Amino acid sequence: LLGIGIGAPSVNEQNQATAHAANLNWNSGLDIINELHEIFSVPVKLTNDANLWVLAHQQFDQTLLSDFFVVTLGTGVGAGICCNGSLLKGREGFAGELGHVIAQNSGRSCSCGRKGCLETYVSANGLIRTVQSLIAQCNNYTGPLLDLSVCNLSAKMIAELAISGDEIATKAFNLTGQILGKALANMVALFNPEIISYSKETVIMEECCLSLPEQFAEIKR
């Protein structure tokens, strides 16, 4: 073993430790580097997981793109940004915290302490919250989602129901795609990328992307 590289959310590049990760049960910064170094006695490096996707593109993608960004979507939302061939980290390494840009003023409460963050709408948990909201608004819905508790709901399950034509699941994905499309269009305006890439950590992105071309076209108009 020559070394260990770790991708994690909410990484402070200055002190090489995780800060408060809103979607993980960590009450304070976790000193992963020293803990692993004591066990394995090899160099340990830590960076944001979305940044590693950028580095992977640069290492293995033969197209040699110099301007692009990668979107990670799971329990949270993140972005790794490459500008002029260089990974954009920011002062402390928190550049690309796409999930915590505001998608809706005074919107849903986020685990980071703010309201209306993008990931409260387009992450896996955000999709589930949208389904719950739609069911509460629809008095005549009689589909299978009525019989499922929050604990038993998953993004994959909602996607399967949307594919089968379930009214609530389909509407939830459409709404999620609209919000995600606007956020990505804003990223395009800011960074002028050659491509947008995404990690397939969850079924959400693949399903939402079906509606993204329409959202981009609407924004351009």
Residue ranges and their predicted role:
Residues 119-195:
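A mobile "lid/hinge" subdomain adjacent to the ATP/sugar-phosphate binding pocket shared
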Residues 42, 46-50, 103-139:
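Glycine-rich phosphate-binding loop plus the immediately following alpha-helix
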Residues 2-4, 10-69, 206-219:
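Glycine-rich phosphate-binding loop and adjoining helix at the ATP-binding site
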Residues 8, 73, 124-125, 200-201:
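Short secondary-structure boundary segments
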Residues 117-118, 202-204:
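Short histidine/acidic/glycine/proline-rich micro-motifs that form metal-
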Residues 62-122:
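Glycine-rich phosphate-binding loop of actin/hexokinase-like ATP-binding domains
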